[in-house]
Amino acid sequence: MRSTKVIHIVGCHAEGEVGDVIVGGVAPPPGETVWEQSRFIANDETLRNFVLNEPRGGVFRHVNLLVPPKDPRAQMGFIIMEPADTPPMSGSNSICVSTVLLDSGIIAMQEPVTHMVLEAPGGIIEVEAECRNGKAERISVRNVPSFADRLDAPLDITGLGTIMVDTAYGGDSFVIVDAAQIGMKIEPGQARELAEIGVKITKAANEQLGFRHPERDWRHISFCQITEPVTREGDVLTGVNTVAIRPAKLDRSPTGTGCSARMAVLHAKGQMKAGERFIGKSVLGTEFHCRLDKVLELGGKPAISPIISGRAWVTGTSQLMLDPSDPFPHGYRLSDTWPRDE
């Protein structure tokens, strides 16, 4: 075999959502901070295209690049690559990265609990891993500060009319809409329709509402989170959600950043307080167990510090190669499986 590059990957998924991890073969990108490094990856696109596009990737795949941390508090940094974005943070991907670091021995596992500090592009995250028999069985992540932006904002959608939405940030930016407003239910059989209408709502929200992070250069809404009503038992709230990810796929997990954004909205509306828990359920029925740990402030905005908890499993190892005669060094996308990102 001949190859001009070899990239070593450990496959992983968190509650159904793929979050593979590059563990070797890629040098750290330029940048003084992990955020700057992630902007290089986003703008350059060479690595993104190689690992995400067909024939080596697919629209279902997210890939994380391990990098040396820039913050002295952190043991490892990571950069998240999604089909259409290189985001500040991801709950499912941070759970995958933590699991791979421990299960593969890159960071030494301590049973029954391992504590780690990781550096995402969006900031420092604290990780607590419940470990047994050489396996990280559950990962809890203190997410970056999360906040509600707009509440009960009118949004005009072609074919639907005016719907009421919230916008919020939970490590990434969301427009949040109740499924009943768009005449849908969150179930696997409606996945294609949910993804398509979700991307349509995201586009409209960017055009009509917009978003700007108070501290980071993040000036767009990334995702539409479609929700069903929250139920409550004591101090535990439970809610089903699904997140439409551009170009048009559904997150298979409950979306950790989405759960964080939803908790921020619930808190802003007086429906959730510090110390209460939230169980987010995905389109597959998998769960993230979350907690609104405390209330704080971010850039003059009321915010929360959320903790998200879930499980991940290693699915295999692989090496991606590039033969010098390969006509597709950057891969390709066809609209039969890669929906048009209009």
UniProtKB/Swiss-Prot annotation:
Lineage top rank: taxon: Bacteria
**GO MF, any single term:** trans-L-3-hydroxyproline dehydratase activity
Q: Which Pfam families match?
A: Pro_racemase
Instruction: Give the family per the record.
Output: Belongs to the proline racemase family.
Quote the protein name from its UniProt record. Answer: Uncharacterized protein BOV_0353
Give the source species.
Answer: Brucella ovis (strain ATCC 25840 / 63/290 / NCTC 10512)
